[in-house]
Amino acid sequence: MKPSLLHRLEGVSERFQELAGLLSEPEVISDNARFRRLSMEYSQLEPVVEAFRRYEGAQADLTAAREMQKDPDPDLRAMAEDEAATAAERLETLELELQKLLIPKDPHDHSNLFLEIRAGTGGDEAAIFAGDLFRMYSRYAENQGWQVEILSQSEGEHGGYKEVIARLIGAGAYSRLKFESGAHRVQRVPATESQGRIHTSAATVAVMPEPDEVEAPEINPADLRVDTYRASGAGGQHVNKTDSAIRLTHLPTGIVVECQDERSQHKNRARAMSLLAAKLFEAEQARQQAEQSATRKSLVGSGDRSERIRTYNFPQGRITDHRINLTLYKLDAVMAGDLDPVIEPLINEHQAEKLAALADE
């Protein structure tokens, strides 16, 4: 094992012991936010420390077996050779496991997320496609046992959405969908096309983690302009009677969010504030990443909304992810919510990139 990797593992073990002590201190136990944060860090380090202990055990076995190989007794030497080979094999397996465990974790992988889909070029067909994408993600969420809450929607004239914003609530939601941000392109014959010509349309998808209480940016009420208006869309007669929909404008950044799904203005405001916090958090994260200007450009982790990431070709039943040259001929299943065959290769590629970066250190 490389000395740099060994040094890092020793540091993780020391931090793990430190956390064990901190979590038993009364002042930490009484501080819920700090206790929760330290407990999460402890649980993240535990599998690394356990694997490192197994590695150290295998290393000790290998050292002992090599000492035994010096014994004059040929039977003992033969047995020692077998033990040394077994220990060396275990070491190799455990080193790879430890490298994977040391890959920096995305602290937001456990988070809920905000999903924003906007129709791009293509007019009515783009709005219909945006609706298809929202249905695809909603079905995937249902299959995962997540909740889907629509915060805001602007319907297309012939179906679908000009824009739809939703909150997806579920363990690990962000970890599964974080690579969906970008431009999605569709190639198909629109229902309104009488000549049977294939049209190309697009929609943009943005996936933002919902920041927790500790990391959510503080929003100064003086920095907000609050507008109320009457909700549009489904909801019966009630929608025309009260100004329950909320639009928040964050004056320093110009970011605008809306929420109109709840009948209560108070609930709409709370949801809009949560969405605004996520957008401000995302903007700050993007700024920090730009400042760091990483030398290794990630293939799948950039999250640039303008980047064309995927093409859905309906005549051929083909879906292509351009970031990793993935092509699947199971478009119907994917559009019906079977997204894992697309998501898993992206996650694996991202992990391989991080593993390569770790090996280069």
From Swiss-Prot:
InterPro entries: PCRF (IPR005139), Pep_chain_release_fac_I (IPR000352), Pep_chain_release_fac_I_sf (IPR045853), Prokaryotic/Mito_RF (IPR050057), RF-1 (IPR004373). It is found in: Cytoplasm. Pfam families: PCRF, RF-1. Coiled coil: none annotated. It comes from Thioalkalivibrio sulfidiphilus (strain HL-EbGR7). SMART domains: PCRF. Peptide chain release factor 1 directs the termination of translation in response to the peptide chain termination codons UAG and UAA. Belongs to the prokaryotic/mitochondrial release factor family. Keywords: Cytoplasm, Methylation, Protein biosynthesis. One of its GO terms (cellular component) is cytoplasm. GO terms for molecular function: translation release factor activity, codon specific. Methylated by PrmC. Methylation increases the termination efficiency of RF1. The modification N5-methylglutamine is found at residue 237. The lineage of its organism: Bacteria, Pseudomonadati, Pseudomonadota, Gammaproteobacteria, Chromatiales. This is Peptide chain release factor 1.
